[in-house]
Structures are given as structure tokens and as C-alpha cells.
Design a protein with these regions (language model features):
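Nucleotide/pyrophosphate-binding catalytic subdomain
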Residues: 2, 11-245
């Protein structure tokens, strides 16, 4: 029995080379991880995935990369702690759940980063801070100082005070990650996902192509995706494309 090597095209080789060059030369890197990546099938924080993420980010930091992690997961962690099956629709309840879950989320990260002697810091933001010039500069200065101290900031939306009706929310952390990238002048934004990539059509189609590279997010690209949310999270591929547009 012979095992055939998968066929690798010239374009795929070039894409890999470009990605490696960007990663190698990037000084500041923003990594965004969503709830679906951080949780298991039961909606609980997945300790193995958090451990893997902390390990990889710590390795980047050890290479003198300045790394910022934008992480969702507070609501999911709070729902698990309070034994809730569905994401609360009532705003006050949702914010209370997020407050409970944020502690569990940060404890999980802290535990894993400590195994690599890597210090992390919590930074909670709302859109209000980045809309106001003075607050914007304060946030920027704080993040830059943390990075200069070789600390990995863990950024999340402050769900306990962010109110969508008052436009103080980012809508999802994909947009927050893009804003933090611009705020810091980071050369690289990595958005982690629980799917293989961007499909040129339905992911359920047997012959649907995965797009290795997207040069520009236009109407054609956006037509491939749809808004998706579930009991634990908001976002989906559409919000990721909107964030980088």
C-alpha cells in the first residue's frame, strides 16, 4: 500500500512563504480567539486549547514578539458556572453572567501562562473608550507599556457595561481585534477559527473550495458567508471579513 503525498500547487507554496515572511518580520501581533474555539461541545472552557494557545503565544513572546490576545469567552464561562443552557436575552442578566465568567476566563489563562513564566494582563474595553480621543490615547499607552514590559495583554469587551442600544459595544470581538491592531500599528492580525477556512460557498458542499488567500473583501467574497450566532457566541465568518475590510 502506497501513501501518496497531497498535491501542493505553486500558489499554495507562495501563500505559505508569504505567511511565513509576514510572521517572521512582524514586531507586533494581535491574535483573536472566539468562544467557539475556546469551548468544548458542552460549552465549557476547553483547558487543553487554552493551554495550547498560551504555549504558542508564550513562544512568540520569547522570540521578542509583542503579542496581544483578544479573547471572547466570558459569557460562555459564566453560563457554565451558573449552569445556564441558553444565552440570556435580558441585558442585565447577560451582563451579570459575563461578570461571573470573566473571572473564570482569566483564571484559566493565568494558570496556563504561569507554566511558561509568562505574565499576562487583563484589559477590558468598550467602544466609548476608543471613540474618545483622550481615552483612546490612554488605552494605547497602557497597551504599549504592557508590551514593553514583555507582558501579554488579554483584551476583551467589557460586557458588564457595554450596551448595544447606546452604541457602546463593538458588536463582536472580531471588530475589537481589528481596532486594537490599528491602535497599536500591529503588522499582523490572526483570527483563529473552528472552521478550516473561508469557503467559496456552503461549507457542507463536497466540492466547495477553500479560499487560501483573499486580496480584497468585496461583495463577491461577502456573498459566500452569512451571519451566524449560537447560544454561546456572536460573530462567524461574516464578522471576521467585516473586521478586516
Amino acid at each position: 500500500m502506497f501513501l501518496l503525498e497531497p498535491r501542493i500547487t505553486t500558489d499554495e507554496i507562495m501563500n505559505d512563504i508569504v505567511r511565513q515572511e509576514i510572521t517572521a518580520t512582524a514586531d507586533k501581533i494581535v491574535v483573536k480567539v472566539g468562544t467557539r474555539v475556546l469551548t468544548d461541545e458542552q460549552g465549557r472552557l476547553d483547558s487543553q486549547r487554552i493551554a495550547s494557545l498560551a504555549s504558542q503565544l508564550s513562544q512568540l513572546a520569547a522570540q521578542s514578539k509583542k503579542v496581544v490576545l483578544v479573547s471572547s469567552g466570558a459569557v460562555a464561562a459564566g453560563m457554565n458556572r451558573l449552569q445556564l443552557d441558553m444565552r440570556p436575552a435580558d441585558l442585565a442578566v447577560l451582563q451579570a453572567v459575563a461578570a461571573v465568567g470573566q473571572i473564570d476566563l482569566m483564571q484559566a489563562y493565568q494558570q496556563q501562562f504561569q507554566t511558561h513564566q509568562q505574565i499576562a494582563a487583563q484589559v477590558l474595553l468598550t467602544a466609548t473608550e476608543l471613540d474618545d480621543r483622550a481615552s483612546y490615547l490612554n488605552v494605547r499607552n497602557t497597551l504599549l507599556e504592557l508590551l514593553n514590559l514583555k507582558i501579554i495583554p488579554i483584551v476583551n469587551e467589557n460586557d458588564t457595561v457595554a450596551v448595544e442600544e447606546l452604541q457602546t459595544t463593538f458588536g463582536d470581538n472580531d471588530r475589537l481585534a481589528a481596532l486594537v491592531t490599528n491602535l497599536l500599528g500591529a503588522q499582523l492580525l490572526i483570527i483563529l477559527s473552528n472552521v478550516d477556512g473561508l469557503y467559496a460557498g456552503s461549507p457542507n458542499g463536497e466540492e466547495t473550495e477553500i479560499l487560501e488567500t483573499v486580496v480584497a473583501v468585496d461583495d463577491t467574497i461577502l456573498s459566500y458567508v452569512e451571519d451566524r450566532s449560537n447560544a454561546l457566541s456572536r460573530g462567524g465568518m461574516n464578522s471576521k471579513l467585516q473586521a478586516v475590510k
